[in-house]
Amino acid sequence: MTERELLTAGLRELGVAECPSAADNLLRYSEILREKNKVMNLTAITDPTEIVTRHFLDCAALAPYMPQDGRVLDVGTGAGFPGMPLAILCPQTEFVLLDALRKRIDFLNEVIADLGLTNVTAVHARAEDYARDNRDTFDLAVSRAVADLRVLSELALPMIKVGGAFLAMKAEDCTEEVETAANARMILGAPDAEVLHYTVPFDEVSRA
C-alpha cells in the first residue's frame, strides 16, 4: 500500500471522516517533517509509512472526541502531535499547539503557513506560564508522550472549562500512573479518570 492508501484505509477503520484536503495536507506535513528532521531533532520515526501509522493514525484516534466549533489545547505538542493531525482532520475545531521550545514552534508555524491552515495557532510558552492568562479557556486539552500524568493534570486541568475534558495519550499499561495522579485530579476538582484502550490500524501496539 502507498502512504496515501494506508492513511485513507486507516482513517476509515477509525471511523474518522476525511475532509477532501486532509490526506494531501497530512502527506505534505510528513514531507516537511522528514526534511526538517535532517537538521532538527523532531522525531525518531522517519520512515514515511511509520509516520502514517505511528504518528498520524495514532493521533487520528482522538478525532471523534474533538468538539466541533470548540477550542482544543495541545500541551507539549513537540513536532505537532497530536494537535496538528487533529487540526487537519477537524477543520471546524480551533487548536492551540503549546510548546516551550522555540525551534519547534518555528517548525509548526512553517507547516501551518505551507498548508494554509486557519484553525490552528502555535504558541511558544511554558504551560505553567500560559495557564496564568488562560484559565477555563478550552473545551478540551490533549497531550501525547509528554510527562507524567500527575504533572500533566496540574498543568492542563486549570485551563479546561467546567464540563470539558483532558485526553492524555499513554502506553497501554498506564494504571499505576493514573492512580498516582488521582490526588491532583481531586484537588483540581476533576472527576475520576477513565482509561480507554485502542489499537492503531496497521500497528500491532495497543495504546491508552
Predicted segment positions?
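Conserved SAM/SAH cofactor-binding pocket of Class I
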Residues: 57-146, 153-154
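Helix-to-beta-strand junctions that scaffold the AdoMet/dcAdoMet cofactor pocket
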Residues: 90, 160-162
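Class I SAM-dependent transferase core
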Residues: 2-73, 103-106, 110-120
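Active-site capping/gating segments
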Residues: 173-208
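Short beta->alpha connector loops
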Residues: 146-149, 174
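Short loop/edge segments at beta-strand edges and connector loops
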Residues: 46, 123-126, 196-197
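Conserved beta-strand signature within the Rossmann-like core of class I S-adenosyl-L-methionine
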Residues: 163-173
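Residue-level signal for inorganic ion chemistry
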Residues: 33, 86, 170
